Amino acid sequence: GNGDDPQGYYSEEYPAAYDNVLSVSAIGCSGSWGGWATYHESVDLAAPGENILSAVIGEGYDSWDGSSMASPNAASVIGLLRSYYPDWSNDQLIERVLSSSDDFIYDLNPDYVDCPDNSGNPVVGGYCLGAGMVDAYKAIGMDFSPNIKFKNYSFEVVGGDGDNVLNPGDSFDLSL
């Protein structure tokens, strides 16, 4: 966490920054980063941490923000994986959560691909919101369907009515 500082800041926070700890940053449920959570290249993963409904002692429920809400989201996915794969090591479970996380958050938050430090200078190659947003469906489903991402591809319509739009019955060349 960032100690309830309303301004997010570039900082290694302990104990989250220790090598043997999975560090989780809080983001919105849609994947957008609200500007108040800690960001740093030591962050391993992002998880929903805005407007999370939680119990309040003696008062029912309330919505909360922060890594205290995001971390249980990430931990629950690891627990779910443990129930599917009881013989896996902790390292295997963590690797699955990281490799199945969704990096679309960097499309929504492009300024955080290269972490801006507290002075606004980019730290090149430092993905400061981690590997992506935790994704329970992908973490469990990776064994049931291929997980293939094509980042660089192009296709060209080579047959059809000449409108350069792929329509039923048209042919195309796909380059990967």
Residue ranges and their predicted role:
Residues 168-176:
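Short beta-strand elements of extracellular/lumenal beta-sandwich folds
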Residues 1, 66-68, 130, 135:
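Residue-level detector of functionally special positions within alpha-helical transmembrane segments
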Residues 13-83, 87:
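Extracellular S/T/G-rich loop segment that most often corresponds to the catalytic His/Ser-adjacent loop
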Residues 20-23, 32-35, 83-162:
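C-terminal subdomain of the subtilisin-like protease fold in secreted/lumenal serine endopeptidases
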Residues 5, 61, 99-103:
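Residue-level marker of structural boundaries
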Residues 1-2, 27:
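A short beta-strand-to-loop transition that corresponds to the Sensor-1 phosphate-sensing loop
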Residues 2-9:
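Active-site environment of divalent metal-dependent phosphoester hydrolases
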